[in-house]
């Protein structure tokens, strides 16, 4: 090949055009633009083509003018083609139809393509396949260039169609050489060096390979193409209603307590949380101290509470004197029924001397005087004597009575000023018909009153607990004798209801006792309800 290339180079430099044409016919080769073409521009290529190619042909001598027209047209088409890294200049007869090219001699029809490895002999059919590969995306393997090239090789190797090749001038190629398959592979691997890493050689398809339609996402560019589900916009829109906040009724338990407490005048915050049970511990008595939240206007009159608890039946008799803000005489608070409930047997007793509520609230004093003695006549000859006790007696007996069974049911009225709880123990003896009774007295006076003495006809003795709220305010003095006479006179209706037990049960908790609507401050006694 080097000899052939040097011979063609010497012919191109020295010989005249007729001698050059004769030399081509003898060698049976077509003149190719030599290695000088890589260093010259396209105008020199056009001039060299116009000088070299218009030689008289043996088969068509009068066609010189026609060849000159074809070469003038070819001058605008003749450009170096960039195949891969190195440009490849194809012969003129490959670019222009109708040119009487001298490769039609019967001796041989092979041409050369300049590559980096030197000139490679290629048949005309394979030169056309180079253009077919240039038009097809060779880098994508799903296009299957080898299958199409083998089909065209079979077409052109069997018989050349004269209509498909007009420049052959109705002449068949006598025998197509079989060796150029290997050089064509070398050319394609040279022009496309990345193709060898993608799979088998381009012109030798793998066995059993058929030109099927390309499979989706099988190309090397498939990672650049997102899946079809990402291109659909609705999965982005579907999660949008999820962050919509759902309203959760968190303040509903508080509103239920506020509705329940709105029916009562200013109830404490812990209303209904501590039912009146007989097993209340001293810790639960401290939990009853949220009574301090109440407005002092509700309890401008602070009273003594006497609760007689029947020991075996876990029932308490409410004998408390209470004063609530001014209410009508016939107004009764709605009873709340619970299991461990107290018997509401309180009856209003008229007071002779009652100061106005503003004076009582401002002075912070209690309505009842601690110096009066109350004698209550109980059935079967029982008598409870209320004796005055000094304020110094109560703290001495404070720590001796903390028992969880008796301290359970004591009621504490709300003082105007919170003070220390003073608890005292005393012996109270009272006779029930078949049982001993526990008497729990809660005194809210400035000077606490303690049960003293013994009950007549005694058959059982019960120890009773006292709970005191001391007040630092000035004591309001009242007529003790008249109050004692009132209490003795009002204690008469107490006998009959206890004997026949025809008492309507009013079940209250530890805080509703402070809300019993009584018009005036009176001594609490029993009265029958039918």
Swiss-Prot record:
TM region(s), chain numbering: none
Region Disordered: start-end pairs: 1-22
Ranges of biased composition (kind: Polar residues): 1-13
GO cellular component, one term: nucleus
Pfam family, one: SOBP
GO biological process: animal organ development; embryo development ending in birth or egg hatching
Protein name (record): Retinoic acid-induced protein 2
